[in-house]
Amino acid sequence: MSLSRTVFRYQPDTQRDEPVIMALTVAAERYPRYGFKKLFQVLRRQGKSWNHKRVHRIYCLLKLNFRRKGKQRLPVRNPVPLVTPEAMNQSWPIDFMHDALVCGRRFRTFNVVDDFNREALAIEIDLNIPAQRVVRVLDRIVANRGYPLKMRMDNGPELVSLTLAQWAEEHGVMLEFIRPGKPTQNAFIERFNRTYRTEILDFYLFRTLNEAREITERWLAEYNGERPHESLNNLTPEEYRLMAETPEISKSAWN
């Protein structure tokens, strides 16, 4: 087998690649849990016009390839696709998560997302979050955003409580319960939960609840205001919401 002299003598131009190396390194340090696609979109949003293949080559040379865990947290499923709403506040999925402090004390998070633009509306953190606390969190959200048409949830005790049912009835909010053992029927927030688990709960050791809250608040600001979402045409949730609130801004203005 013979090789052309051009291929045989090729040496990478490290000086030419230096700006790409620097930009990728800075982005990877700023967003340590991002894979290649997200990092590439970060560079694009910074105005970098480097070729996709070139950036990927350097990404691999820098060994930034995201390591996947050998064991999956959830089994492979065939989820039923959810219909994305056409406007804000049509559908809010809500859910609980669990984790623990370094001392072993367990805490819970109450998560609220808007299906329309995947915006995380709240992550409430405490040792215990009863139904009354759930209602207070929802009141805090609707004070700035308005009431949703419906909320989608599982059959947890706080969510099937009379307290939440009365709140929903008073404000004309429909409660939609998924079937027991079918988390894929709430797929949008399940995906959000996985991202939050991977990038925050599994990534940090929390000594106090306040530490968990502060780190989560910083992450929420990044998630809503900086992170491009493929499902939103690589806009951030805040950009997508602004586009919906300002009809004269066409989608092409964000591309």
Describe each PLM feature range:
Residues S49-V113, E119, Q132-R140, N144-L149, ...:
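Mobile-element integrase/transposase regions
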Residues R68-R73, K150-N155, E170-F188, Y204-L209:
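RNase H-like polynucleotidyl transferase catalytic core
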